[in-house]
Amino acid sequence: MEFAYAKETDKYVANAIISSGLIATTAQDNTAAGLLGYAAQAAQLVYSNSLGFARNIVVSPEQWANIMGYNDSGRPIYNASQPQNAGGQVGPQSLRGNVAGLDLYVSRSLSALTYTTGDGSMFVINPESYTWYESPRLSLRSDITATGQVSVAYYGYGALATKVANGSVHFNKN
């Protein structure tokens, strides 16, 4: 139940951030060059609109796989130990990494929102623009003596506060 609760809250936050943020004004191809163009433009838009720096990029698992596969003449850009053209560090052993100077996070909720590798499949964010507030979670159990069953309920409340408008920019696929 804890996992189901976490999935739903993650999906809620991802959807709220995407719907309240900006879309990149220039559509980019879903390539290594497109990723760098998007990251540069998104960082500029976040700073221009929120007066804070873009520090994170959140991607769907499908985009994570794309980023790990980006290469330059067969040499991996993000997934090698000593690359000559390192653009960051992304690997299959962690859902965290670094892409173009932004901290990378992978969220399966972006796939659940039907964003896989198109618009909304990743967003660059100034984390100071949003805050997630959450109550302690409570699990209630009650025995149903007539049938021998146990009823379990899991409660928690949360809210996302947008502190600075337009603190995120999501991908605009060409």
Model-derived regions, located:
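Alpha-helical scaffold segments that mediate packing/assembly in large oligomeric complexes
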Residues: 1-49, 170-174
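Residue-level marker of positions within ordered structural domains that often coincide
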Residues: 2, 6, 109, 155-157
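Protruding loop/beta-arch "assembly-hinge" segments enriched in small, turn-prone residues
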Residues: 10, 137-174
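An acidic- and aromatic-residue-enriched active-site/binding cleft used to recognize and process polar
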Residues: 18, 62, 157
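Hydrophobic alpha-helical segments involved in membrane association or supramolecular assembly
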Residues: 18, 104, 152-154
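Extended oligomerization regions of viral-like shell subunits
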Residues: 29-150
